Regions:
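A generic structural signal for solvent-exposed, polar alpha-helical segments
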Residues: 32, 74, 113, 138-139
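DPxDG-like acidic metal-binding loop motif
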Residues: 83-138
């Protein structure tokens, strides 16, 4: 599955649908508790990162790597897993970390599946609100 083909859409859409549900369960079982915060910028401003950001990204990476071991993964907290695949997954484990820190439920997990650098499918998952949105850029 390293070729762009709309026939493969259900494989990726089903994966992301299940991942959204798994991420919400993961949040309530493992992360709905106190967390540690650090500053990614080290004295040149403030860009918070939490232990939850890192845990979410590790969880997402493990799910993607298990299902699509040859795909590239680009994550905000742990960088790039390069492969020769034309598929890449781009992860923002907690979009809205500042909202997460203060308890505002509007934060989300953002995941994009790209092919040759172009978006193919995207997931915006809101675990605290138990909602998610899946969208494609293809017809």
């Amino acid at each position: 599955m390293d070729q762009f083909n709309l026939k493969n859409y259900p494989i990726y859409a089903n994966f992301l649908n299940k991942l959204a549900k798994d991420l919400t369960k993961f949040y309530y079982k493992k992360l709905d508790k106190p967390f540690k915060i650090s500053n990614k910028l080290k004295g040149k401003g403030y860009d918070p990162v939490t232990t939850s950001d890192k845990a979410f990204e590790k969880f997402i990476r493990s799910k993607i790597s298990k299902k699509f071991p040859n795909h590239q993964i680009i994550g905000e907290e742990y960088g790039h897993k390069n492969t020769k695949s034309k598929f890449s997954w781009v992860i923002d484990p907690i979009d809205g970390t500042r909202s997460y820190v203060v308890g505002n439920p509007s934060w989300s997990n953002l995941i994009s599946l790209n092919y040759n650098g172009e978006p193919y499918l995207g997931l915006a998952n809101f675990p605290k609100m138990k909602k998610y949105y899946l969208n494609t850029s293809k017809n």
